[in-house]
């Protein structure tokens, strides 16, 4: 009951997207910050770069910001006032480096006064204005074949959308077609060539309809594509990745499924034999995980990505820990709280430790005043006058952790449970005497704290300051491994990279290989990889080492011809190394209809939102002549009820939607599936057992892994 109350109250904290000046439609996706541990960030996104996730949480473009301009030509070619602006609307939350005057924007929009031959055709163009950090995309069209006057619909957005603008351009072009038809209908109905200058006074609802299309459809579409972080799929031949994947599969089967429930084998068999290939062929196909447990959903997504593609085939970039080497007393460490970059210096201390057997008591030994903790706005005495438990078996440092956590607010670093794991009392007595404590500053928004941290925590063990997860995150199907709340010991990913040859035993070598994945730090943005190596190789092929070619001598029929062998082996580049990542993401608080793989909060309306987005896909497909999609499918996975079902919607000849639901797993039993699928489930189960038992031979491990994740159609 408590978990449900917490989960319900947390939903009210999210502010609707673009609520400052628009009424939000169904297409809106809200991208809100959420808690995720550093190891999951590395597994899902290939990096734990703090700047990437801070941008996701705080610096979102989109907040619905845009500037819409509708303008037209008046037919006065020689006049300076040849262009008239019908609408110039800027949303309140549209912030750019410089406000571009309308005169300059009109030059960008209409450009040269030279006309095209075909006046009936509309044209689109994209302009990047680097000085203002904006992107301007424009639709220019004519009233009819006889008219020579151009009408333009232009939109300014921040340049953050540039990587995905061409990706989602088919959808944007469809919406621009709607806007164009709306204005053309107004001109035809009123038998005029010009839009009204004061459209509000003339009650021109068509202009308002165009503005509403941008507010409710085009801008949320760009936001859904560009604001959501996309998953990084590790290479299929990476031994650390395979070992980590096997570890997660083993934990799921042993701790969550148990000996009777075969939830994971059935789900993986469905992907392997049926849905993975469908997801690759049809962009309208989705996998949606409905859950109230973010951590379990993210672990399941990591498991499912092995069956999806394309996987990265380049070089994995490893993080460099320059501060990992220990040094004698006097070494420097960076501030873990991130409040200041000024390093504190370690010096030996003569502070003593009191241990009693009388439970809670007032310490009678005078402490070093250096380790007292007081509030900035208080004149009270230090921490040596506080009551402390003898079970903590440490000096003032443990009480400092307790005091700091009790006084900290949302902006503070971590929670009390997290600080207990960091405090010297949670470690062995031997380690507490080896290195003296060190003072650190906390970046709390309400108070100033000094935390006593053991010196053996180096600067490379810094984690992203994040709020602690709520109880609701561990309520549903509890994960029995130590939670990130209760542990903060040095993880494998935070160690100094050590050569494999330095390990003496096979067990140490396997442990090192498995932990290598946590050292990955790929250069990336929210939706793209920064693959400089592939770019340099392509440049070298074209410029530094150009391909060989033959020249055909000119004659009376043709000029000189350069013949390039396009079938050259060097030109057969691997298309898997694409910068733009696929639309797969992890847990998001709200459903994003534009992504193919995601997990979202389960509510009473979750399934209805998914079905409604599927119907919209078919509607958009009818408007786009290039698309021939007549059906769309979604694999719905409910972790709360452990149900798996495939929802398919088709459109018949009468344009009616027909929905079919195929239950794969319900109430712990396999649904009415084909014999081939039943055989596939048994085969997948056997492959998983062999994979879990194979730990010594890396070649056999890679072979078994590739066998199980290779998609095979039934």
UniProtKB/Swiss-Prot annotation:
Residues 423-447 are annotated as: Disordered. This is Protein LST4. Residues 61-236 form the uDENN FNIP1/2-type domain. The keyword Protein biosynthesis does not apply. Residues 244-620 form the cDENN FNIP1/2-type domain. Signal peptide: none annotated. Belongs to the LST4 family. GO terms for cellular component: cytoplasm. The gene is LST4. Involved in extracellular amino acid uptake. Required for the protein trafficking from the Golgi to the plasma membrane. One of its GO terms (biological process) is protein transport. Pfam families: Longin_2. Keywords: Amino-acid transport, Protein transport, Transport. The keyword Protein transport applies. The lineage of its organism: Eukaryota, Fungi, Dikarya, Ascomycota, Saccharomycotina. Residues 634-712 form the dDENN FNIP1/2-type domain. Coiled coil: none annotated.
């Amino acid at each position: 009951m408590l978990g449900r109350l917490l989960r319900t109250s947390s939903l009210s904290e999210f502010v609707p997207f673009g609520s400052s000046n628009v009424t939000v439609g169904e297409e809106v996706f809200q991208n809100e910050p959420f808690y995720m541990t550093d190891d999951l960030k590395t597994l899902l996104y290939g990096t734990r770069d703090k700047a990437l996730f801070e941008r996701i949480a705080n610096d979102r473009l989109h907040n619905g910001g845009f500037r819409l301009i509708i303008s037209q030509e008046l037919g006065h070619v020689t006049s300076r006032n040849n262009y008239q602006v019908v609408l110039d609307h800027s949303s309140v939350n549209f912030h750019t480096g410089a406000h571009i005057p309308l005169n300059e924007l009109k030059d960008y929009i209409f450009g040269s006064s030279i006309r095209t031959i075909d006046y009936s055709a509309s044209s689109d163009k994209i302009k990047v204005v680097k000085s203002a950090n904006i992107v301007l995309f424009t639709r220019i069209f004519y009233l009819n074949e006889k008219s020579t006057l151009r009408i333009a619909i232009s939109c300014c957005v921040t340049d953050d959308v540039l990587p995905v603008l061409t990706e989602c351009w088919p959808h944007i072009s469809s919406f621009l077609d709607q806007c164009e038809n709306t204005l053309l209908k107004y001109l035809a109905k009123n038998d005029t060539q010009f839009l009204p200058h004061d459209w509000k006074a003339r009650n021109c609802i068509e202009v308002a309809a165009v503005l509403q299309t941008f507010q409710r459809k085009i801008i949320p579409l760009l936001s859904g594509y560009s604001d959501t972080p996309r998953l990084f799929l590790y290479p299929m031949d990476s031994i650390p990745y395979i070992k980590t994947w096997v570890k997660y599969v083993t934990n799921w089967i042993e701790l969550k499924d148990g000996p009777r429930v075969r939830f994971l084998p059935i789900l993986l068999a469905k992907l392997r034999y049926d849905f993975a290939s469908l997801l690759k062929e049809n962009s309208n196909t989705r996998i949606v995980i409905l859950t109230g447990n973010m951590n379990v959903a993210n672990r399941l997504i990591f498991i499912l990505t092995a069956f999806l593609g394309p996987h990265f085939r380049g070089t994995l970039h490893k993080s460099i820990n320059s501060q990992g080497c220990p040094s004698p007393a006097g070494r420097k460490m960076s501030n873990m709280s991130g409040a200041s970059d000024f390093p504190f210096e370690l010096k030996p201390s003569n502070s003593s430790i009191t241990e009693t057997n009388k439970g809670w008591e007032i310490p009678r030994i005078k402490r070093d005043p250096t380790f007292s903790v007081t509030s900035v706005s208080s004149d009270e005495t230090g921490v040596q006058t506080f009551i402390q438990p003898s079970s903590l078996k440490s000096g003032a440092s443990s009480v400092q952790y307790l005091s700091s956590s009790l006084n900290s607010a949302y902006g503070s670093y971590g929670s009390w449970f997290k600080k207990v794991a960091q405090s010297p009392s949670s470690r062995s007595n031997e380690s507490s005497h080896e290195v003296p404590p060190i003072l650190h500053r906390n970046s709390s928004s309400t108070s100033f704290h000094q935390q006593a941290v053991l010196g053996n925590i180096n600067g490379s063990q810094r984690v992203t300051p994040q709020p602690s997860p709520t109880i609701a995150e561990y309520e549903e199907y509890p994960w029995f491994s130590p939670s990130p709340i209760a542990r903060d010991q040095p993880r494998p990913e935070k160690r100094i990279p050590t050569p494999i040859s330095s390990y003496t035993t096979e067990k140490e070598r396997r442990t090192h290989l498995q932990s290598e994945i946590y050292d990955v730090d790929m250069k990336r943005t929210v939706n793209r990889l920064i693959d400089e190596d592939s770019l340099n190789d392509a440049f070298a092929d074209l410029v530094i080492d150009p391909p060989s070619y033959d020249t055909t001598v000119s004659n009376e029929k043709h000029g000189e011809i350069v013949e390039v062998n396009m079938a050259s082996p060097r030109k057969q580049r691997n298309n898997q190394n694409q910068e733009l990542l696929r639309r797969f993401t992890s847990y998001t608080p709200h459903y994003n209809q534009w992504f193919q793989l995601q997990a979202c909060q389960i509510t009473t309306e979750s399934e209805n939102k998914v079905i409604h987005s599927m119907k919209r896909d078919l509607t958009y497909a009818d408007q786009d002549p290039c698309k021939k999609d007549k059906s769309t499918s979604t694999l719905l996975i409910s972790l709360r009820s452990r149900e798996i079902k495939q929802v398919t919607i088709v459109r018949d000849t009468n344009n009616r939607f027909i929905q079919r639901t195929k239950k794969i797993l319900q109430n712990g039993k396999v649904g009415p599936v084909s014999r081939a699928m039943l055989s596939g489930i048994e085969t997948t189960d056997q492959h998983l057992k062999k994979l879990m038992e194979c730990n010594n031979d890396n070649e056999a491990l890679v072979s078994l892994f590739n066998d199980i994740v290779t998609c095979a159609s039934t």
